[in-house]
């Protein structure tokens, strides 16, 4: 592997969730927390690094390269609508598993309004209870895997770190299409009620609250981001 094929942004680690209660996140964008491996992905389709073809590097949370998902890399090249991208996302088999393989035990579901109250009012859990839900789970190359793009850190060589999250997501939508191997993460704004039961039924354990105006700080905690567990009963 020559120097031009080496990843450029290994020092940029995914931004971490903060230590605050979700109720303190101002003007949140709310999204299901994917079960999978948190990664950053760099793509270049023109320039010195792409002389022999598109350059794609998938990096784990330690900045080490993951080379076991060529179909995902090829899928990303197919749907990219910019000459270079740096993406925050997840490698997951959750899309292909579907609800029939949900790991959530079958229990009686509360009413939708009760779900929201339990999460926001009765959710006096400590942060350490959520730590396992944040932990990145290594992706398995033996099963169908999808890249879920949830944030955009750079486009066409221009850093977006100081661009508000909502605008970063809008830009992501404009520069990344979708296919079998690449999807954009979904997000909603309050009220949550129409979404909680649906998300839980298809296998999500937790949801992320991210301030719409938050900036991105690679490798650091951001108290504009928080996690809440979806109540199970």
Residue ranges and their predicted role:
Residues 1-233:
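Catalytic cores of nucleic-acid ligases and guanylyltransferases
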């Amino acid at each position: 592997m020559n120097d031009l094929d080496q990843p450029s942004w290994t020092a940029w680690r995914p931004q971490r969730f903060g230590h605050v209660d979700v109720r303190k996140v101002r003007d949140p964008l709310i999204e299901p927390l994917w079960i999978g491996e948190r990664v950053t992905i760099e793509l270049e389709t023109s320039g010195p690094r792409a002389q022999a073809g598109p350059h794609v590097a998938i990096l784990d949370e330690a900045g080490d390269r993951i080379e076991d998902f060529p179909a995902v890399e090829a899928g990303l090249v197919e749907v990219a609508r910019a000459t270079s991208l740096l993406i925050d996302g997840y490698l997951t088999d959750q899309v292909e598993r579907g609800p029939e393989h949900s790991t959530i035990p079958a229990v009686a579901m509360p009413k939708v309004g009760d779900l929201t109250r339990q999460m926001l009012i009765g959710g006096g859990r400590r942060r350490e209870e959520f730590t396992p839900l944040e932990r990145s789970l290594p992706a398995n190359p033996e099963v169908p895997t999808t890249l879920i793009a949830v944030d955009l850190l750079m486009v066409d060589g221009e850093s977006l770190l100081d661009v508000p999250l909502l605008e970063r997501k809008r830009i992501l939508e404009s520069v990344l299409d979708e296919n079998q191997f690449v999807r954009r993460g979904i997000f909603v704004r309050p009220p949550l009620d129409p979404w909680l039961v649906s998300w839980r039924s298809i296998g999500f354990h937790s949801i992320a609250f991210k301030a719409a105006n938050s900036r991105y700080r690679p490798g650091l905690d951001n108290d504009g981001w928080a996690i809440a567990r979806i109540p199970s009963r």
